[in-house]
């Protein structure tokens, strides 16, 4: 994730339910985005990324991705632009909205460890590879990114051991990392970290923090591994060691069905 953290998505259903449909032409084809009016959260680079693909696009700015989605639902904007998995989560819980299949930009998401922690990187890569080789990876995606409805409950993954695996995350990136109804930090990234802890025979401890604090905390040794929809970039790779990519995401467009 290259954008600033968003507010919790727990109110999205009730917020969107208040809105009606406007008189704008529905976006049904990716090419229609070329001159579309986008709703984007203030303080992110979503507008810059969209403009790099569609120079003639227009932008309206909102306080959060929730407000941007509401603008689309009410007809105040043609599309909302944000991280693909977060938009998919919104669309899954709110009939009448969908994410266009073609992304505007493409990013690879990965977990990060300290530059010298080759053993932990190898363990993460092995878990990712083994899950992809079987059915577990797709089952995990179906669990956290259902076509309709909210994510399924966090699976029970017992982690035990004298050593602790400290997993740093920012629980504002539903469905990758978020706080559920029981006030536990859950999500696809948390599940993956638990599987890594199991492989290493360690006990998982989740450390929730601000998105921008994750890399500094990792470098300082406050956590062992970080993950929260983190985009693999050359600049970040100068200071941390990334795992293999576990998800292809990027900036996508949320539109009315």
Regions found by a protein language model. Give the residues of each.
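Acidic, polar ligand-binding/catalytic clefts
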Residues: 22-32, 84-106, 115, 194, ...
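Extended, hydrophobic interaction surfaces within ordered domains
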Residues: 31, 57, 64-68, 74-149
């Amino acid at each position: 994730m290259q954008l600033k953290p968003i507010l919790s998505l727990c109110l999205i259903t009730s917020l969107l339910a208040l809105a009606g449909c406007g008189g704008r032409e529905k976006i049904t084809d990716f090419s229609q985005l070329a001159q579309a009016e986008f709703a984007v959260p203030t303080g992110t680079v979503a507008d810059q990324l969209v403009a790099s693909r569609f120079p003639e696009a227009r932008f309206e700015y909102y306080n959060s991705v929730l407000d941007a989605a509401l603008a689309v639902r009410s007809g105040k904007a043609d599309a909302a632009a944000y991280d693909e998995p977060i938009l998919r989560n919104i669309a899954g819980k709110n009939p009448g909205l969908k994410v266009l299949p073609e992304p505007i930009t493409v990013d690879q998401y990965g977990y990060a460890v300290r530059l010298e922690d080759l053993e932990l990187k190898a363990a993460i890569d092995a878990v990712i590879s083994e899950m992809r080789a079987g059915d577990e990876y797709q089952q995990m995606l179906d669990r956290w990114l259902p076509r309709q409805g909210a994510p399924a409950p966090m699976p029970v993954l017992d982690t035990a051991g004298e050593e602790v695996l400290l997993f740093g995350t920012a629980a504002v990136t539903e469905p990758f990392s978020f706080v559920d109804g029981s006030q536990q930090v859950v999500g696809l990234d948390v599940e993956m970290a638990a599987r890594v802890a199991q492989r290493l025979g360690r006990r998982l401890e989740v450390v929730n923090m601000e998105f921008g604090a994750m890399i500094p905390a990792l470098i300082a040794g406050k956590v062992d591994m970080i993950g929260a929809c983190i985009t693999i970039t050359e600049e970040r790779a100068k200071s941390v060691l990334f795992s293999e990519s576990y998800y292809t995401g990027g900036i996508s467009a949320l539109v009315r069905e």
